[in-house]
């Protein structure tokens, strides 16, 4: 690792970082790890990436900054050695219904180019290959095919259009032509005055009568050129004896019928272009299914009383402001029964109109159109015209190797890769030259998707249906395909959603990025990824206020005591003083000075919980016994949605159950999209549409369903652990009961920061104010009035055990638990938060600052604090996302506690520490996509580890 350059970070203080300084090598594969909430993302994204983005923004003009905004300078003293940065995060790729895997990877763009340049057109009428010829080829073919035969040379001048064509007939007579073939009949021009104007006609003008021979070649050539000119590039030849007609054209034409097609262009195959999209669904593949009787079930009810169901009852909203304007313009009352209103008005409200209506009064009024309520109706069906392909019918006439572009886009990536490689011998010589470079680009990009474990996806898969992990790996594959160099890539847990089998491909892809001359920094908890790193950074030692320090920053081989070095790998003999030594206090292998002297001053080596797990000094132990369950089951019969193949499954209750399998094998389909919607509809009167299935059995054996995901506990900065757990109500009641509050007449509402009264009205109880700045980003500043304390001074004068309400909100949860230990209603809920490892989070910390793992554990704690019935089914989907080994140990403890209370926990997971700790596993596969959808193995972890049909079994065997 000689002569490396470094990114030097000095004094990083974003969020909980404690003046962190470190050096990270460039052009290396670096993993940043640490507990959930330790400051990993603060270092990687809020410091390094934010500074890189800010420097890029600084290069833009003031005018551009006005539209793009400016990133605030991160809280860091200095960063040097920074390259241009690309961050690839876990977020989904948005909800644009036109966006697909093919469009965001640009693979579909290359596919469109391939079809435009190298596809073969087939006649929709005869199924024969359509042809195109040059002028010389047409003359040669006529000379060859009709030698010595009497024939008519004709120019098609009208193709299937209505009209009397009186002027056209007269014009042709004046130009000296005497015959036409009209609708298949040969006619003399001087005998026809006009045609039936309401009938579609096919008119071919007889340009010459021929009997091709070599001596007449010049005349034939002149006649053909004249016919091509009149027929806009097409001619027809009719044998006088057999009356057989054959068509020749410089454009694509059916040789039997003369049907011609426009030359294909890339936009002809685009569902985002009018030239390519299905005219019925406009390229969306789906249409809104509108049943007016469902929208208006009772026409005797007025609009104001909720007669139009999606609108609800009349209220003060923008939508109803426009509807009131419509009512004024058409002179109707919204309080009259709908059956008495004009149909045109009801149609306008449902379907919308371009008509403008005045909304508002005086100078604030404006003219607006109404889009209708169609957009509020979510029931959509596959477009009956294009069958969900998004493309118009014309695209189906063009094929490569017998496949249309829609059929290719529907292939899984593995099939697509095989098909592309099979095309090498398919193209003719000319097409082969055209397709060569396009095919190379397609093969490369499809190969990158295979490398990141996305073999089960298809190009026509909507991006809105992708998980965050899938979206991130698609962006990673796209970046590998871009072949950029000297870039710093920062990735956020790319292993999410990946089976161990695919994770190794992902690591190889990350190293490929590095080997092309880039720096790769990955925020990750996956042990296999860490062990593959060149350099490891561990942020900690704890989380929240206990984190923010750099515990480790050093080459992995040094940390693990592996003596490999630049000199060792080149065969140089190691000096005698290069023996590894172990620090008896930290247990860490110390660096060999003679080998790593150039890196020694860049390293930080302290105590690290992460390294304890990597070296085996600490481990998450598998349970010594597996539960047998309570003898009852919850079963699904005939589950067949997505790729599920009529699956029958019985989940044993009273157990911790793992759902394993490769990505795309059907785990989410059977749990999240079949079982969960059925149970939500049953227990909570939801109106969800599960995937197809035959029946659910044993539903009477549970009485509640709880889904615990990683979504935020609140969507606004005002949500916090105190409000989420409900302890804030109890705390405010305590303050109301204090002597000071009673003397002042303060009720519990006085101590709320969400309503007027006791809160600071300058900042509305937020403690901060947002300052809007022209040409600069908005700035959050501490409120001058309350100095960030949220409340008025007289509210803060009321104290409980020496603390005011703001002091309580600023306490870490562990401190708050001790403070309220004698109040059971508060202590019980806070203890649950401490038990799940959230003692470091402040009681009043904004929900939007909590990580996904913290939010999930908060929800688990809320469940632990409740008095359950013991018959609850808990479902968790990849709960280890964002969790360190220590966090996973805590999470496992909570899940085991829930099962010990008699409940059932189903967890969809790839993490082996979780899977080896469950009581029973269902392994899905054998592959992803169409090759999946089956339960290939089930049983205890020990049974799976020895089951040859299990894909997960061999990996379990390594850890059991």
Model regions: which residues?
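Conserved phosphate-binding elements of NTP-dependent enzyme cores
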Residues: 1-960
């Amino acid at each position: 690792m000689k002569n490396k350059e470094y990114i030097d970070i000095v004094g990083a203080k974003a969020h909980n970082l404690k003046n962190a300084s470190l050096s990270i090598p460039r052009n290396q594969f670096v993993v940043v790890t640490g507990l959930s909430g330790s400051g990993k993302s603060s270092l990687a994204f809020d410091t390094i990436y934010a500074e890189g983005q800010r420097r890029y923004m600084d290069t833009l003009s003031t005018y551009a900054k006005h539209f793009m905004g400016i990133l605030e300078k991160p809280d860091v003293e200095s960063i040097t050695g920074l390259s241009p940065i690309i961050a690839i995060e876990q977020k989904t790729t948005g909800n644009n219904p036109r966006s697909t895997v093919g469009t965001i990877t640009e693979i579909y763009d290359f596919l469109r180019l391939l079809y435009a340049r190298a596809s073969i057109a087939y006649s929709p009428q005869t199924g024969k290959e359509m042809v195109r010829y040059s002028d010389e080829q047409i003359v040669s073919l006529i000379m060859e095919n009709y030698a010595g035969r009497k024939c008519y040379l004709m120019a098609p001048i009208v193709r299937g259009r209505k009209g009397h064509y009186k002027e056209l007939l007269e014009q042709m007579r004046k130009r000296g032509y005497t015959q036409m073939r009209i609708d298949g009949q040969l006619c003399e021009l001087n005998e026809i005055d006009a045609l039936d104007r309401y009938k579609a006609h096919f008119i071919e003008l007889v340009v010459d009568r021929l009997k091709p021979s070599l001596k007449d070649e010049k005349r034939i050539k002149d006649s053909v050129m004249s016919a091509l000119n009149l027929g806009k590039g097409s001619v027809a030849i009719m044998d006088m004896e057999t009356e057989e007609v054959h068509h020749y054209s410089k454009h694509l034409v059916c040789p039997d019928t003369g049907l011609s097609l426009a030359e294909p262009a890339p936009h002809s195959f685009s569902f985002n272009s009018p030239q390519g999209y299905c005219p019925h669904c406009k390229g969306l593949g789906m249409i809104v299914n509108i049943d007016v009787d469902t929208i208006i079930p009772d026409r005797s009810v007025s609009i104001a009383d909720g007669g139009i169901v999606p609108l609800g009852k009349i209220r003060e909203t923008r939508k109803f402001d426009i509807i009131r304007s419509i009512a004024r313009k058409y002179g109707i009352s919204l309080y009259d029964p709908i059956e008495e209103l004009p149909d045109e008005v009801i149609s306008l409200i449902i379907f919308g109109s371009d008509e403008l209506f005045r909304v508002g009064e005086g100078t604030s009024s404006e003219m607006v159109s109404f889009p209708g309520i169609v957009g509020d109706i979510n029931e959509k069906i596959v477009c009956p015209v294009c069958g969900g392909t998004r493309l118009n019918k014309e695209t189906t006439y063009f094929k490569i190797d017998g496949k249309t572009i829609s059929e290719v886009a529907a292939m899984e990536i593995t099939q697509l890769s095989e098909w592309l490689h099979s095309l090498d011998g398919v193209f003719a010589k000319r097409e082969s030259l055209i397709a060569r470079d396009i095919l190379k680009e397609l093969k490369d990009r499809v190969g990158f998707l295979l490398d990141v474990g996305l073999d089960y996806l298809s190009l026509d898969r909507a991006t809105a249906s992708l998980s965050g992990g899938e979206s991130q790996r698609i962006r990673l594959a796209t970046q590998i395909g871009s072949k950029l160099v000297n870039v710093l890539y920062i990735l956020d847990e790319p292993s999410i959603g990946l089976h161990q089998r695919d994770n190794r491909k992902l690591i190889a892809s990350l190293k490929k990025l590095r080997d092309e001359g880039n720096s790769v920094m990955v925020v990750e908890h996956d042990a296999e990824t860490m062990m593959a790193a060149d350099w490891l950074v561990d942020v900690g030692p704890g989380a929240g206020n206990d984190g923010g320090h750099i515990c480790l920053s050093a080459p992995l081989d040094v940390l693990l005591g592996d003596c490999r070095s630049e000199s060792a790998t080149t065969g140089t003999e190691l000096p005698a003083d290069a023996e590894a030594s172990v620090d008896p206090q930290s247990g860490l292998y110390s660096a060999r000075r003679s080998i790593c002297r150039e890196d020694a001053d860049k390293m930080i080596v302290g105590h690290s919980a992460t390294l304890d797990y990597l070296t085996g000094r600490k481990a998450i132990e598998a349970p010594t016994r597996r539960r047998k369950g309570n003898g009852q089951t919850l079963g699904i019969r005939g589950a067949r949605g997505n790729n599920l193949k009529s699956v029958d499954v019985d989940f044993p209750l009273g157990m911790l159950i793992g759902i394993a399998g490769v990505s795309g094998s059907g785990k989410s389909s059977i749990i999240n999209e079949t079982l969960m919607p059925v149970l939500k509809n049953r227990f909570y009167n939801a109106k969800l549409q599960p995937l197809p299935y035959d029946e659910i059995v044993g539903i009477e054996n549970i009485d509640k369903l709880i889904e615990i995901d990683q979504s935020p506990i609140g969507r606004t900065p005002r949500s916090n652990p105190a409000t989420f757990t409900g302890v804030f109500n109890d705390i405010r009641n305590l303050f109301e009961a204090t002597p000071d509050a009673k003397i002042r007449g303060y009720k519990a509402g006085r101590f709320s920061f969400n309503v007027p009264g006791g809160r600071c009205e300058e900042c509305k109880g937020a403690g901060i104010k947002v300052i809007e700045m022209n040409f600069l980003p908005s700035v959050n500043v501490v409120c001058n009035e309350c100095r960030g304390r949220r409340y008025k001074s007289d509210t803060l004068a009321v104290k409980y055990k020496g603390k005011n309400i703001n002091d309580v909100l600023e306490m870490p949860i562990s401190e708050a638990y001790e403070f309220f230990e004698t109040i059971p209603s508060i202590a019980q809920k806070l203890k649950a938060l401490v038990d799940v490892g959230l003692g470091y989070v402040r009681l009043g910390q904004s929900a939007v600052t909590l990580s996904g793992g913290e939010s999930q554990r908060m929800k688990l704690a809320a469940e632990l604090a409740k008095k359950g019935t013991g018959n609850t089914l808990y479902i968790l989907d990849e709960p280890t996302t964002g969790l360190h080994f220590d966090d996973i140990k805590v999470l496992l403890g909570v899940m085991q506690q829930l099962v010990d209370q008699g409940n059932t926990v189903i967890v969809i997971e790839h993490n082996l520490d979780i899977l080896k700790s469950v009581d029973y596993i269902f392994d899905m596969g054998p592959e992803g996509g169409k090759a999946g959808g089956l339960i290939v193995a089930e049983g205890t972890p020990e049974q799976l580890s020895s089951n040859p049909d299990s894909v997960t079994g061999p990996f379990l065997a390594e850890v059991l």
